[in-house]
Amino acid sequence: MEEAFQSDYKKRGCRWAGAVSLPPLPKDALVLETGCGNGKTLSAFSCRAVGVDISSEAVRLAGAKNAVAGDVRALPFSDSVFDAVFCWHVLGHLMEADRIKAVSELFRVTKPSGSVYFKAFSASDFRFGKGTEVEQNTFLRGDGMLTHYFSVDEVLSLFGDGEVFENNWSMRIRGVEHPRSEVIGIFPKNRF
């Protein structure tokens, strides 16, 4: 996985563009963005933010002093540090056992009063089924990118109690409409 991202960032530079819509957070909040990539979302936070990405090339492109190379399965941070942890379109690039490890790490670095914010593609997305299926609902594309497509129930099973919903929209590509779909969730650490 790391090699695929390193290669792609070196070849294309910026992978994702577009406006970022963030939930309101207190100005004094400390936020972690996992999979910070080129820093697009990291730079949009109006509070203190730290980014981590498996690709050192992405971290270099982000040009941010507050971004480090690291793995979401073994985050290089102490316990209970962040008020909010964002994991947007990261877990879908992992196999099931690694997704479970990563979720444990996300909660480990979140303060007891904090929350984990999740977003990933759902099985309703038009790209579902493209590539070679390597696990249920997980596909390996020709460029080496692994993508898992989630269901709401799967996300609840992975994270536990929280607010989860599916967001559907349409994207026009070369004059043809394609269905896009994400599962989005917010999971307070202190759920009990």
What label would you give each PLM region?
Residues 100-112:
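A short glycine-rich, Lys/Arg-flanked "PGG" loop and its adjoining helix->strand segment in the class I
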Residues 73-85:
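A short acidic, Gly/Pro-enriched loop at the edge of an enzyme's catalytic core
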Residues 87-90:
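A short beta-strand submotif of the Rossmann-like class I SAM-dependent methyltransferase core
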Residues 92-94:
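A short His-aromatic
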Residues 1-74, 98, 115-192:
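Class I (Rossmann-like) S-adenosyl-L-methionine-dependent methyltransferase catalytic domain
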